[in-house]
Amino acid sequence: LISLKRFNEVAGKNKIYRGYDLKTYSSRGEKNCRIIYGNKYDKLISNVKSFSPELAEWLIVEGYGKVLGRNGLTLKERVVCIVSILSALKFKDQIYSHINGSVRVKVGIELIYKVISNLELISAKSSSKYGLSVLKDYQLQKVNSV
C-alpha cells in the first residue's frame, strides 16, 4: 500500500478514467498478431480457443492490441524486446515464434543476435546461450526450407 500511495503522489491526481474502445484494441491486436505470426495466425488462435476462448480474446485485446500496440515503441522494437525476454525465460517455442515475427517486421538477424547476446551484460550468459541456440535453429530451418 505504501508503494501505491507513493505512486499516486508521483503520478498525479488524475482520477478520470478515459476508458477504451474494445473494437479498436481488438482490430489493432488482430492486425499486430497477424503481422507477427503470418500464415500461422489462424492456427495459433484456433489452438488457444480450443482450451480457452477467453484467453484467445485476452491475447488479442490485451497482448497484441494494448501492449504491443501502444505508443512509445514501434512494433519492431517491442517484438525484438520480447525475443530477449523469452530468451531469459528459456521458452523455446515462443522464442522461435518471436524471432520469426521479428524477421517478418523487418528486424535484421544481426539485431536479433545482438539483443539476445546483450543478456550477458546482466550476467544471464546461460539465457543468452539458450536464445542464440534457438536463433541458430531458426536460421538452419530457414536455410533448409529454401
Where are these regions (language model features)?
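Acidic, glycine/proline-rich low-complexity segments that act as flexible tails and inter-domain linkers
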Residues: 1-75, 104, 117-146
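Short acidic alpha-helix initiation/capping motifs at coil-to-helix transition points
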Residues: 57-60, 89-95
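Short, glycine/charged-rich beta-strand-loop motifs at protein surfaces that mediate ligand recognition
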Residues: 71, 84-89, 102
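Short, structured motif recognition centered on aromatic/hydrophobic residues
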Residues: 77-86, 95, 115-116
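Short Gly/Pro-enriched loop/turn and capping motifs at secondary-structure junctions
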Residues: 87-91, 121-122
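Short conserved catalytic/interaction loops centered on acidic-Pro-aromatic/His motifs
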Residues: 92-100, 105, 113
